Amino acid sequence: MDAADLREYIEFEEGEVVRKTVFETERLWAQTVCLDRNGSYGPVSDRAADALLTILAGEAVFVIDKKRKRLKQWGATVVPAAAELVITNASTEPLVVLMVVAPPPPAETD
């Protein structure tokens, strides 16, 4: 059984989005997305996968296919397959989002 202390996957770099893979299997992928103040991530989409986003720390504005929702810590939302996603930090505090995607996206190539 795999287990993780999510605190080990939290890291911030000024002006950067820091993403760290927590788990990856054939059917599921989980990562943290860390945004400093005024940070944003996206737009991104995956035609074949749904995603569950949970705020672990901070406050975010999620724009999913041009629909806007503001959520605080412990808030969660679903991003349907093929939907475009943008995440924006909505507070002066750092933002940490746990993103769980199924099925996992194709491997990134350089």
What is each PLM-predicted segment?
Residues 66-81:
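Short acidic-glycine-tyrosine-enriched beta hairpin
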Residues 45-47, 90-91:
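Short glycine/proline-enriched turns and hinge-like loops at secondary-structure junctions
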Residues 81-106:
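Ligand-binding loop in jelly-roll beta-barrel domains
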Residues 1-29, 42-43, 77, 108-110:
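A short, N-terminal "cap"/entry segment at the start of jelly-roll beta-barrel domains
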Residues 40, 47-49, 63-65:
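Compact, glycine-rich, soluble single-domain proteins
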Residues 31-46:
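Conserved short histidine dyad/triad with adjacent acidic residue
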Residues 59-61, 68, 84, 94:
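Structural motif
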